[in-house]
Every structure is written in structure tokens, then in C-alpha cells.
Amino acid sequence: MLNRVQILMKTANNYETIEILRNYLRLYIILARNEEGHGILIYDDNIDSIMSMMNITRLEVIGLTTHCTKLRSSPPIPMSRLFMDEIDHESYYSPKTSDYPLIDIIRKRSHEQGDIALALEQYGIENTDSISEINEWLSSKGLACYRFVKFNDYRKQMYRKFSRCTIVDSMIIGHIGHHYIWIKNLETYTRPEIDVLPFDIKYISRDELWVRISSSLDQTHIKTIAVSVYGAITDNGPIPYMISTYPGNTFVNFNSVKNLILNFLDWIKDIMTSTRTIILVGYMSNLFDIPLLTVYWPNNCGWKIYNNTLISSDGARVIWMDAYKFSCGLSLQDYCYHWGSKPESRPFDLIKKSDAKRNSKSLVKESMASLKSLYEAFETQSGALEVLMSPCRMFSFSRIEDMFLTSVINRVSENTGMGMYYPTNDIPSLFIESSICLDYIIVNNQESNKYRIKSVLDIISSKQYPAGRPNYVKNGTKGKLYIALCKVTVPTNDHIPVVYHDDDNTTTFITVLTSVDIETAIRAGYSIVELGALQWDNNIPELKNGLLDSIKMIYDLNAVTTNNLLEQLIENINFNNSSIISLFYTFAISYCRAFIYSIMETIDPVYISQFSYKELYVSSSYKDINESMSQMVKL
């Protein structure tokens, strides 16, 4: 089986081979090395990410294992409480989602009954979800005529004599709980269908949930330490045997991985006496170092590991940065060379444990030299980029694309007196993330040729992006940028599905769309009803000039980095949900998707196989390569 996987990896440059490889990854984790000997753990969830970073056909497959793990994600963002908006109808009043809908109803009724309003003003009322407690309050204020009566009881003729009583329809709604509707007109009332929505857009639009990007960038420097974890092969899979740091200590233990990690954590705690946060800098650490340690992470050690962050029980944080994500695809030695430090070779990962033990002294020496080189290169790069991209700091970002684009957006917006804002709360962040669709939409299963947008950067740099804080609107304004919660109805006739939905049997569903995606969907024949939106009154003008200025500055500093960065930005604009410019990514991806759809409009739908926001698969039998298709490159 190992031989089969090794052959597949060497030829993994086409869709069919990669899909076969995925089948193996459902059962095993592939242990591989790059040319410099750095270990790489390949599993089903990260193979796409690895392929976007490197040519996997050049990796050496060392073995297969089930004794390893994926990165441990941060605790999931709690799902926002489902929301029902207020409905004030001539026949009834349904309050918006609330812990105390009965209190909302009595306050609503006070708008029509002055004596209730006066009592509320003079005495107030405590929150309660009990009808009997509300009725007790009404009676104590001489307002028993407005007592609350359940609809079912009223229909039993028990309260006919109370003509002014407050009749409420009581119900329990899944994921919300008790809800009440005030029935204003018994003659015309029928229980309404109320949309239960995933977001409360009015809440999300609150000013305090949004902060200007520039205010979060100018942070003081935090202590930086280069680190590398080395793994050896055993019969039970790979184990970490050495953790090296610079400046700092090297920890080696062949007998107990637990003690190896605990000694490292004790050292970390000792050096954090004067700071609550430190930065560990590795190279390809997300592909090997962190997942390898995660497998063996001790319970009750006082630290939790989530993805690239260590959090102690007393709140201290260690952020593990991956310098590879700022290297634009360079090898470790090339990265060190291009940023002015002496390139040094590093110890090979995934060697036999016996070999590692026998050569431990030389491996420690080799590791320290390599880490010193990495540390010096990173310090040089971070210092240079933080001058050019001020006020951005490298440790505030997880990859160079985010840092570069944030710098450009900040500079352009500051020059125009407007700023881009980002959410400081999980719920608005989740709302923005929900408007992103990176999935492929399948149209027809057929043998196809793959096309990609020639330059994503050209498309997104000529568009406009939201500036300032958003406002809540019931329906978005044509010509303005907004993100809306939408009820989408699929066209009844044959159509190309342009709005992703994971249930083919549903013709109506609720989802989050940008104003750009809404326009695209309407062009494709979809019916869209907006259920509330975040709308921006101001736009950041096009970014093209700002991009060109920033590119020139970085090119003068380091041509190799600039050329590789440009290549990455031209081919990809991948959404990063932890980025402070997630709002930019949301609209950038929508603009790309609109561009893809404009090309699909020129092609007979029978030839379209599938598409994403940047790629289009067209039947191999399609020969009419028109002018629109010339804006894409065949892969």
C-alpha cells in the first residue's frame, strides 16, 4: 500500500489521481518530507491547503499512519440564537425574540392605553415570563381589566366578560422557547407563519460591535522565539523527540514525550514573567510541529493547545507563527538567504528513533544553527515589512497576503478620510463568514477542462469595498454595498445554480448574500426576498493605485518576495475567517463569482460542468472559445 501511495504522490498533478489519493487519506495520514527534510503530515482536511502551498509531487513519502491527529481547532463559535423579528399587524402583534415576550407585549399595549403607560412610568415592572405574575401586577395597579388571557382559555367562554383583556396566543418554538402573540382582532386573527432566522441583523449593526481597522494594528512588540519540533519514526507512528528554541534551550527526551512537552512548557512559563503573550516562530509548523505535539499533549498540564495558540490556565497566551506563510513559497534556506541570514541545513524529520538517539548531539547542534538563521531572517523581514506596511505588525496576521492587503486597504482608506471597520464580536463575524461560498457548484457531471481566472488581483483591485460602520436596513438600496439575510427561491425552469445550497430537494431556503451576489442571482432567475441587511453608505475607492505603490515599495526591498507574492495574489484570494479584513474578502470573492457567471452566460449550459468563485470546468467537447473565455487560463 505504501508503494501505491508513493506512486500516486509522484503523479498527483491531475484531478483523478488526487481523488484516488483522497480515498487513502480517509483511512491514513501520510508521513512525508520536503527536500530540506522537514516533516509534513498530510490528511484529508489539509491536502488542498498543502497543494496550494507547494508541489506535492516533489515530496518524499516516508510512511502511512493512523497514530496522528489533525490540528485541534479552537472551541467553535456558539451558534447565534435563532431570531424572530417583530411583526405589528392590524390583527396581532408578535414581539421579536426575547426572554420576556409578555413584557414586550405589555409595553406595546401601553402605546395605546395611557393608564398602562402611566403605571409603567411610575412603578416599572420586573421582567417575568409568568402570566400570573403580570396579572398580579396589573391588579395591584388597578388595571385588572387588561389582564392576560390565553387564547385557548378565552375560547372556552371563561373570560368573555373582560372585553379589554389582553388575549395572547401561546406557543413553544424550537431553539427559541416560549413565545406569545397578542391578538388584537379575534375576528381576523389566524396564527401567522413567522420566519425563524439565524441572525438578528439589527443587533449585528450596533456601533460597539465594529471597530476601525487602524486602531487594532499599532501594537507594541512582543517577545519572539524561533522554535522547531523534530519527530522520529517508531512502530506506533511518529513521535516528537526534540524541541529546539532560539534564543533559548533545546529539549531532548527519547523515553517520555510527556516529560519532553512538560519541560518545554515549564521553560515557556518561566520566560513569561514580564509579558502575557509571546510569539513562537516556526517554519511549516502548521504542517508538522503543532499537529505532532497535539497528538501527545498531556492532560491537566495547565495549557490547552488550539490550532496555533497555546493558552494557559491563568490566561497567558503563546502564538505559534508559521514564517513559511510569509515566505511566498520559499524553502527555509532560500527564505533565510533572501532575508540576509546565513542559510543552514536542519535535521531531517521522520528518521528512525534509533538513528536520532545515536546522533542526538550533532542533531542538537544542527538544529540550533538552523534556528538561529531562521530567527535572524524573521527579525529582518518583520522589521522591514512593518516599516513598509505600517501600522501592520507581522504577529497580527497569519499570512503575508492578509498583511499586505490590510496595509493597502488601510492606506487607501486613510488617504480618503474613511476607514474599513471589522466586527469585534463572534456573531457579526459569523454573519460575514456565512456570506462566503468557496464550494464548487456542480452543474453536470462530464469530462471537463479546467479554467481559472487569469488575474484575480486585476478583478478585485478595480472594485469598491465598504467603508465606515454599517447601518441596519430592512432592504438594501440599489447601488450601495450591503450584506443581507435572504429568502431565496430557486427558478422553476432549467437554470445554472449560482447560489450554493446543500439540499437539492429544497426550492426555498434562507442564506446570507452580498449585494453583488444578489445581483448575480437575480440575473440567473432567482427570486430574492431580503429579510434585513447591513448596508454601508460609503465606499473605499478602487485599490489599484494603492496596490501598485505598495508592490513597488516591497519590490525595491526584495524582488523575489514581491514576485512570488504577486503570483499568489493573482491566482488566489482565499478567504481567511480570522482576518480583520474578512469584510474585504467577502466582497472580493463575490466580485470574482460575478465575473465567472458573466463568462458562463456566454456558454451553452450543457457544456458547464462545475464552477467556484475563481474556476470554471467546461466540457472537453466544447470548442467555441470566445472572447470572454480568453480572460481565463486553461490549466
Curated annotation (Swiss-Prot):
InterPro entries: Poxvirus_F12L, RNaseH-like_sf. SUPFAM superfamilies: Ribonuclease H-like (SSF53098). Induction: Expressed in the early phase of the viral replicative cycle. It holds the Pfam family Pox_F12L. It is found in: Virion membrane; Host endosome. GO terms for cellular component: host cell; host cell endosome; membrane; virion membrane. GO terms for biological process: microtubule-dependent intracellular transport of viral material towards cell periphery. Transmembrane segments: none annotated. Belongs to the orthopoxvirus OPG056 family. Plays a role in intracellular enveloped virus (IEV) transport to the cell surface through microtubule transport. Together with protein OPG064, forms a complex that interacts with host KLC2 (kinesin light chain isoform 2) to engage the kinesin-1 complex and thereby promote IEV trafficking. Interacts with protein OPG164. Interacts with protein OPG064. This is Protein OPG056. It comes from Vaccinia virus (strain Copenhagen) (VACV).
